[in-house]
């Protein structure tokens, strides 16, 4: 991380890698379990679409405001204890939204849910970057692949619970009760980084370094495309190509599965091509996918387009976090800056797609997604490793 740290009883790199990968999977599983029960919460509280949309803004607000605190917490308590506590809070928060008695309570609980998610997100990415740097080869794509796999596993459990008519309050409480100790045990193998006594604590709130904001702009393009595709692909298939509900749902499955598979395989590609060439190639694939979506007059073409979008953007955010680890004297602060920008993109994307669709068409909305994917091709150079940084990839990328 930085020169002003010492590691106490640091575990072997293999053990640390497995531990952080498990943490990513647990974090993703929380997301997957919750996402599948949103319709239950909507029906239970008799919310309109607008009220639900308002409530679902609060996790992103909570995450964006809390993320800058993660670095200070890690400095105060050490990386392993901070990750263990933040992940436990995030897992425990899973049980709370379904218990909300009304809209105001739901907004407040989702704010806390998002805040704990964001801080845990920064902590686990900071430690993932630390392990990657010490191993001297790319692992961040695989870690985010484990997050995607955890999301798919959590969503499968949630779908089974919903299909079986299980009350979401019971389902999410049981899921939280399982995930809290699982996450706690996983953190036992995480790196334990303690600041030296003379090391200055990072400020509670501070702007990240400019280089982190530039890296965040690349992440913004990728997460905008991801958020737009995840939230709107099924609607696009139904409204534009006339797909049935089942076929429309398949477009989401194609997108999510290709993203997960690409992330799990992405480290090998990064090691061979380097981060710049990998993101440029992915950006080109995403542009092709976006053009297929925009031009689609048949369901297979649109589904193929969304799948290519998933492949193209899959490794961008992991590589942005890896680059942020070198973007300033306090890696956790730079990572928090990148994470905040990407969370903002995830918040803006679904609404922006809806606004453009209302003013013009869904096809025009995904024209914007295609333009942002092209931005990955143009801006990938900001991810080039700094001079002297140890990488296991070609120096040109």
Residue ranges and their predicted role:
Residues 41-42, 73-74, 160-165, 237-238, ...:
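Interfacial helix-cap and linker-helix signal at transmembrane-aqueous boundaries
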Residues 273-320:
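C-terminal transmembrane helical hairpin of 12-TM major facilitator-type secondary transporters
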